[in-house]
Design a protein with these regions (language model features):
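Loop-helix junctions at membrane interfaces
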Residues: 1-238
Length: 238
């Protein structure tokens, strides 16, 4: 905990920027929810908070279990923490989804701390929101199975496009500076698992793009399978 507090002090300006972006995403979600989301589930405020907190806690625990992928360098690892968050957004709307995403990352920081000066944690939040927001907004606009599938497909596309660009433009250069290595060294790590990776753009194409597609597909599929079943348990749906 002391290391986390010290890291927060050293990166105060960055954390304030992250907070501003988080607030902006919550406001954006609230606007979309007000304009587009009809027939949302009514739930007492206390129960809503408890429900979001419960799913965020599950997501934070899932975030601790990371799976390396054969086609990507070792610093890209899959976790399934977006599943509870996407479920939360489908049950309660985009605002609850973004808040759940934020609480998930905060809980993970309390459980495990940060090894990336909060950069990786911020990236997880922002990239996760690019899946959660489009999927939940489109679903709540119509609340049908078809729109749920379309929303998750749109969210996967948005996450893949944004995540790939974000890695190329910001994350990879930032990590190179942070760890005192060159971008060429990062590319070389990718080349060890895939000889087709010879540049940053090819690293993104052959590692980041399939990583995000796979994560989006798995998250969407599990959410689709669990949504009604858990809904009956939590909301006594028939």
């Amino acid at each position: 905990m002391s290391e986390l507090i010290q890291s927060a002090k050293e990166n105060g300006l960055f954390l304030l920027t992250c907070l501003a972006i988080a607030v902006g995403l919550i406001v954006l979600a609230a606007m979309a929810q007000k304009l587009l989301c009809r027939g949302r589930r009514s739930m007492p405020a206390a129960r809503r908070v408890a429900f979001v907190a419960m799913l965020a806690a599950v997501a934070a625990v899932l975030m601790l279990f990371e799976i390396p992928l054969f086609f990507a360098p070792s610093f890209y690892k899959m976790d399934f923490s977006e599943i509870p968050v996407l479920l939360c957004s489908f049950y309660l709307g985009p605002v609850a989804g973004v808040v759940c995403e934020l609480v998930k990352v905060l809980l993970k920081l309390l459980l495990k701390g940060t090894t990336t000066a909060f950069v990786g944690d911020f990236a997880n939040f922002v990239v996760g929101c690019t899946l959660i927001l489009p999927a939940s907004v489109l679903y709540h606009a119509h609340r049908t199975r078809g729109y749920a599938i379309a929303g998750m497909a749109l969210g996967t596309v948005c996450m893949t496009v944004f995540g790939s660009a974000f890695n190329a433009v910001y994350l990879l250069p930032r990590f190179a500076v942070m760890y005192g290595i060159s971008l060429d060294a990062i590319v070389a790590m990718g080349q060890q698992v895939n000889t087709s990776i010879t540049s940053v753009s090819r690293l993104v194409l052959f590692a980041v793009v399939p990583f995000n597609i796979l994560k989006g597909v798995i998250t969407s599929l599990v959410t689709f399978l669990l949504y009604k079943r858990l809904g009956r348990l939590f909301f006594r749906e028939g």
